[in-house]
């Protein structure tokens, strides 16, 4: 296991308190460049753009925000900012600016103004984690919410009017699932049949597949305030398929996180992937592949840190996403599909973490690691890239180049004679005279 040091960092100002899932990266203004979204317990959403230490704009919400997200939740072809509070308030913000630009090229209509939601609705309270994704394979995105009482609910936006621009619909409830353990993560991965599958983490390095068994041709009741009763939301045990990833579990109650659809190359960008990863608070990391008969364990790693967040990020640029896990003390592990481990240390305690693409510098998205600390700062490490994950040396690199062998032959040195070639390289580098 080798250590790396990333030095390209910007510090953002953030004075609030936040829940672990109230942070995300996404394109909130639909300009193809990602922003950083952070929601706090006072109901304020801060949107950071580029390397500016202060928020580009803020949004006002009702209640303590537990999760934020960015996506085309209304299936209108553009991203919206979604913020959900513990009290059950669901907020939608349309931050796509007007087409009028000021002299500097910025969107003058948004900067400095506190944004109000374009839509607000009450859903069941005690929200914990949120996912915006197509979970049933119909090509439309759904909203999935995990709750503190071990319940997961799926919603869909239902349009009531004809206008393509204005939001004239509401969230409707699709299904409710009841889990045995606490839900800490929601994700989607590609199932054996090529269709998306909704996954939720379960304690003890376990997970469950939630079956989407609703009928698409029937209406759904609105996600109204208060309890939502009715046959369509009756939790059914047969719609929750629990998977234990290990026969020997050290702590069956340990908190578990997961991330799915881990890319295996540029060719799988659109088709998805059946790879998924899990991590636990007691330091277990696993990469698995979902198969038709039984899940396949690709590797398992045990570390001596408490892992509280799990992400995926392509740090080598080859289309293969690495698994990124963060501990409370700032220790970050980056592991590739071959179990090669690289670690990175942030010298502060961390209360929230996310990873992804962010347009910090140079007007383009780059791989970033985002850490929320306890000292009113958010650290964004940008351009987080490695030439390769595995360790190597100069001789191995030179052996891949044809001109290296021809130069050795001109000097009368056998390329297979390692002691002689190492001595020659040492003399060339350190004693050229």
UniProtKB/Swiss-Prot annotation:
Organism listed in the record: Pongo abelii (Sumatran orangutan)
Keyword match Membrane: yes
One Gene Ontology cellular component: KICSTOR complex
Superkingdom to which the source organism belongs: Eukaryota
Descriptive protein name: KICSTOR complex protein ITFG2
A Gene Ontology biological process term: negative regulation of TORC1 signaling
Oligomer and partners: Part of the KICSTOR complex composed of KPTN, ITFG2, KICS2 and SZT2. SZT2 probably serves as a link between the other three proteins in the KICSTOR complex and may mediate the direct interaction with the GATOR complex via GATOR1. The KICSTOR complex interacts directly with the GATOR1 complex and most probably indirectly with the GATOR2 complex in an amino acid-independent manner.
Per-repeat ranges for FG-GAP: 19-48, 126-155
Job of this protein: As part of the KICSTOR complex functions in the amino acid-sensing branch of the TORC1 signaling pathway. Recruits, in an amino acid-independent manner, the GATOR1 complex to the lysosomal membranes and allows its interaction with GATOR2 and the RAG GTPases. Functions upstream of the RAG GTPases and is required to negatively regulate mTORC1 signaling in absence of amino acids. In absence of the KICSTOR complex mTORC1 is constitutively localized to the lysosome and activated. The KICSTOR complex is also probably involved in the regulation of mTORC1 by glucose.
Location(s), subcellular: Lysosome membrane
Family annotation (SUPFAM superfamilies): Integrin alpha N-terminal domain, WD40 repeat-like
A family per Pfam: Itfg2
Modified residues (Phosphoserine): 104, 220
UniProt KW keywords: Lysosome, Membrane, Phosphoprotein, Repeat
């Amino acid at each position: 296991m080798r250590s790396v040091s990333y030095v390209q960092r910007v510090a953002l100002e953030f004075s609030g308190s936040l829940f672990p899932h109230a942070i995300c990266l996404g394109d909130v203004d639909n300009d193809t460049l990602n922003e950083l979204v952070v929601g706090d317990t006072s109901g304020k959403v801060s949107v950071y753009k580029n390397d500016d230490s202060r928020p580009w704009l803020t949004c006002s919400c009702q209640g303590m925000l537990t999760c934020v997200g960015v996506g085309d939740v209304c299936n209108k072809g553009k991203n919206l900012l979604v913020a959900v509070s513990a009290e059950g308030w669901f907020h939608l913000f349309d931050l796509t600016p007007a087409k009028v630009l000021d002299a500097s090229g910025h969107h003058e209509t948004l900067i400095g103004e506190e944004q109000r939601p374009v839509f607000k609705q009450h859903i069941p309270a005690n929200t914990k984690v949120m996912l915006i994704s197509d979970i049933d394979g119909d090509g439309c995105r759904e909203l999935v919410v995990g709750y503190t009482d071990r319940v997961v609910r799926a919603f869909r936006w239902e349009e009531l009017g004809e206008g393509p621009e204005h939001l004239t619909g509401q969230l409707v409830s699709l299904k409710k699932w009841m889990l045995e353990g606490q839900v800490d993560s929601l994700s989607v991965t590609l199932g054996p049949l090529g269709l998306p599958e909704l996954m939720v983490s379960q304690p003890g390095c376990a997970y469950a597949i939630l079956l989407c068994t609703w009928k698409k041709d029937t209406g759904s009741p609105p996600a109204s305030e208060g309890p939502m009763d009715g046959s369509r939301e009756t939790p059914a045990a047969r719609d929750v398929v629990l998977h234990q990833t290990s026969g020997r579990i050290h702590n069956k109650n340990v908190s578990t996180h997961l991330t799915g659809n881990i890319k295996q190359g540029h060719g799988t960008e659109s088709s998805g992937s059946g790879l998924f990863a899990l991590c636990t608070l007691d330091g277990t990391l696993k990469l698995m592949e979902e198969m038709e008969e039984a899940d396949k364990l690709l590797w398992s790693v045990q570390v001596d840190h408490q892992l509280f967040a799990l992400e995926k990020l392509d740090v080598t640029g080859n289309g293969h996403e690495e698994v990124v896990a963060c501990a409370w003390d700032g220790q970050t592990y980056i592991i590739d599909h071959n179990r090669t481990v690289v670690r990175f240390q942030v010298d502060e305690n961390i209360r929230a973490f996310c990873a992804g693409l962010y347009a910090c510098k140079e007007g383009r998205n780059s791989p970033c690691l985002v850490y929320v600390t306890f000292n009113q700062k958010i650290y964004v490490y940008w351009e987080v890239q490695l030439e390769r994950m595995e360790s190597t040396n100069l001789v191995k690199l030179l052996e891949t180049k044809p001109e290296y062998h021809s130069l050795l032959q001109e000097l009368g040195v056998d390329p297979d004679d390692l002691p002689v070639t190492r001595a020659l390289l040492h003399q060339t580098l350190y004693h050229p005279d």
